[in-house]
């Protein structure tokens, strides 16, 4: 079945699953992302861990698909032959955590010193803005791939810095600012990305009016 992006380019999945290897272990003091797993897969894995333990109910939103061509090899069967990914209108994840509506994006960069705004879209910023106005807990999980560092960064700060672009502001968020204003997450065994610990701090900061 052929899938296409909204710009008409064909979709190809270059990710390959790596078999688990036995033997050599990394240092017990340092944990990195699970080998062969993308950031999205790591978060999905963590969300499942949280759901199974009744800690939170958070899911990845499905990507809308527009079906273009369908074949009917039999009257009771339908086979999708061609489809397009529609442009997403909101963010990657949402759900409920301790009575709070949670909404967030997951982004990664190969940069080492800043996180570029080109990773975001205006519709995502607008969605964050609307959710915050309703009292939602909104943030971005940012990953600096070369550094293997993860952060929960408040959407309120992202929106302010995004808006500042129009008046000559930076086109990226410096790593130093993310370290100062965000919440760093350390990889661990289960869940691999324990981001709810950072969300607790984000909620506490909000209640203090910081």
Swiss-Prot record:
Pfam families: RecU. GO terms for molecular function: endonuclease activity; magnesium ion binding; nucleic acid binding. This is Holliday junction resolvase RecU. The lineage of its organism: Bacteria, Bacillati, Bacillota, Bacilli, Lactobacillales. It comes from Latilactobacillus sakei subsp. sakei (strain 23K). The keyword Flavoprotein does not apply. Its EC number is 3.1.21.10. Mg(2+) binds at residues 90, 92, 105, 124. Residues 1-34 are annotated as: Disordered. Belongs to the RecU family. It comes from the Bacteria.
